[in-house]
Structures are given as structure tokens and as C-alpha cells.
Regions:
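Extended, low-hydrophobicity, polar/charged segments
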Residues: 1-160
Length: 160
């Protein structure tokens, strides 16, 4: 299957080097990111999930480790907003041009501000969705931040 998606094309246009990883996507999977991490044999803390949120009613994109939970309070603060909530899946699909389970912070149809969980960036390589269910891209965190024109912020709920 082709690895050319709007996300991989955006990375190429940005001049970012990356490698692709494919796995068998299982529809209806509860924790897509954890399933992807297991399928590609990578630590779930390095496999990041892309979550579309609404901050004060406007779209934004939060990218966090697949084994962590997003804090709505922290994501609102990261974007200088008063409130945040998860975006309904159908709205996220219309806005990004990607299907749920395949949403990437790169190459979205309608660009939204992006923030990455800062604690996930202290590794040589992170893995994110490549714009299609079952397709991941692996690249250095600094390149991912630059390509997504993203900020690094504290976005996750406390563990424990």
C-alpha cells in the first residue's frame, strides 16, 4: 500500500527525513496508540497519539504519548485558553482530512495550532501517525516540532 499521504507529503515539503512503519490497523480498537506501539514493537511512550481538541471553541491539536492521558486544563493553558474539550470524531475528520485512527499533526486539511507533550521529546526518535490508519512515521522530535510548527508544552495528566 502507498505511503504517500498528505502527512508524508508535508514532511517531504518541509525537508524532514523520516521513515515509515506499517502495521495492521484493527477497527474498533479502544486504545489505538497502544495497539500501534505493540504492533510495531516500540515503547508506547515513544509512540505519540494526535488528539484534536477545541480550545475556547477553536480547533487545536495535542500530541501526547500513547500511554498517557491528556489534561484538558493543561491543554487550555498551553494554548492560552480558558477551556478545552475533545473534538467530536466526525468534526476532527472533516477538519483534518484524516480518518480517526489515522490523524496526523502534519498535512492537515485545515491547519490548527499544534502542541507536543514536552516530556515525550527527550528521546532520539518519536513515532506518530502518518496520515493513514496503519501507517506511522518515525523522526527526531526536533524535526517533528519544526514540521508541525508546534510548541512543546506540559499537556498530560499526572501519572499515578
Amino acid at each position: 500500500m502507498s505511503t504517500a499521504t498528505p502527512a508524508t507529503q508535508a514532511l517531504k515539503r518541509a525537508g524532514v527525513g523520516f521513515r515509515t512503519l506499517e502495521y495492521d490497523y484493527v477497527a474498533g480498537q479502544d486504545r489505538i496508540g497502544l495497539h500501534a506501539a505493540e504492533a510495531i514493537g516500540t515503547d508506547p511512550g515513544r509512540v505519540l497519539k494526535t488528539l484534536m481538541v477545541e480550545i475556547d471553541g477553536k480547533p487545536a491539536c495535542a500530541v501526547i504519548p500513547s500511554d498517557r492521558t491528556l489534561s484538558m486544563k493543561k491543554v487550555a493553558a498551553a494554548f492560552g485558553a480558558k477551556s478545552a474539550q475533545m473534538m467530536p470524531p466526525d468534526k476532527a475528520e472533516r477538519l483534518t482530512g484524516f480518518h480517526t485512527g489515522g490523524i496526523s499533526p502534519f498535512g492537515q486539511k485545515r491547519r490548527a495550532p499544534v502542541a507536543f507533550e514536552v516530556s515525550a521529546l527527550n528521546v532520539p526518535e518519536i513515532v506518530l501517525n502518518g496520515g493513514r490508519r496503519g501507517l506511522m512515521v518515525a523522526l527526531p522530535p526536533a524535526d517533528a516540532l519544526a514540521a508541525a510548527e508546534a510548541q512543546a508544552s506540559d499537556l498530560c495528566a499526572a501519572q499515578g
